[in-house]
From Swiss-Prot:
Highest classification ranks of the organism: Bacteria, Pseudomonadati, Pseudomonadota, Gammaproteobacteria, Enterobacterales
Role played: Cell division factor that enhances FtsZ-ring assembly. Directly interacts with FtsZ and promotes bundling of FtsZ protofilaments, with a reduction in FtsZ GTPase activity.
Protein name: Cell division protein ZapD
Top-rank lineage group of the source organism: Bacteria
Record note on quaternary structure: Interacts with FtsZ.
Cellular component GO terms held in the UniProt record: cell division site; cytoplasm
SUPFAM superfamilies per record: YacF-like
Keywords assigned: Cell cycle, Cell division, Cytoplasm, Septation
Length: 250
């Protein structure tokens, strides 16, 4: 297959915990990409991501699931100890990192609590559900805050992001290990359809040539999955009888 610059990477979670983690990862990325808050547009993107992140964190015990996964990844690494030729120093380093992340996560306050208690975040969060509800006459506090010196705003935003560090660091490590647990292999779909067993996997990763102008519609769970390729142009698009793509089951 061509180089990565000419392909699109799609990811699909095969269980609810991975679905939640990918959503949290996406929201954390939005926060870090828009943390400068130089105008109202970037500010609303930032605060909307915070509001959605808090909503996700309130739906389940994210900390417990992450701690379980950190322990599971440690046990998986331990199994590699018996494999001849394995880099034991690398194994020990990763296990030590996982233990440190678990300790930090265990000692951290309730996920998102620092953000929930912030007055400005609370005010903006209340108005985000109203279409156009963050105008200057609705939120004069935010309007005034955005005209504060940049260094003052950066200091406050830095504190917000720092409060999420235990969550972000643990999640980044877990998702990195999950993603690297699968190897991309070439596959062929017939008339736009492909299915296979998932072997108790957590995540599907699919690479597809941009030139095909197709996207995958994926359904599945931890034991089996199905992929149907559909054209971006639903009226004039073409699905080749045999389509080559790359798939990693992680």
């Amino acid at each position: 297959m061509s180089d990565a610059s000419s392909t699109i990477l799609f990811e699909y979670p095969l269980n609810e915990k991975t679905r939640t983690w990918l959503r949290i990862e996406s929201l954390l990325q939005q926060l870090h990409q828009n943390h400068s808050l130089t105008d109202m547009g970037s500010a609303l993107t930032f605060f909307r991501a915070i509001a959605e992140l808090l909503d996700v964190l309130e739906r389940g015990d994210v900390r417990t699931e992450l701690l379980k996964e950190l322990e599971r990844q440690q046990q998986k690494l331990l199994q590699w100890s018996d494999v001849p030729g394995v880099d034991m120093e690398r194994i020990h380093t990763l296990r030590r990192q996982l233990k440190d992340l678990a300790s930090t996560l265990m000692a951290a306050p309730r996920m998102g609590q620092f953000l929930r208690e912030d007055r400005l975040i609370g005010m903006v969060r209340q108005r985000l559900g109203i279409p156009g509800g963050c105008c200057s006459f609705d939120l004069p506090t935010l309007h005034s805050w955005l005209h504060q010196p940049q260094e003052l705003r950066e200091k406050l935003v830095s504190g917000w992001l720092s409060s999420l560090s235990p969550l972000k660091q643990a999640l980044d490590m877990i998702l990195e290990l999950i993603r690297h647990s699968g190897i991309f292999r070439p596959q062929i779909s017939l008339n736009g359809f492909f299915q296979d067993n998932a072997s108790d996997a957590d995540l599907l990763r699919l690479r597809l040539e941009q030139a095909h102008q197709l996207y995958p519609q994926i359904s599945g769970h931890k034991t089996r999955y199905a992929i149907r390729f559909l054209p971006l142009d639903s009226e004039n698009g073409h699905i080749p009888p045999r389509l080559t793509f790359e798939l990693a089951c992680c």
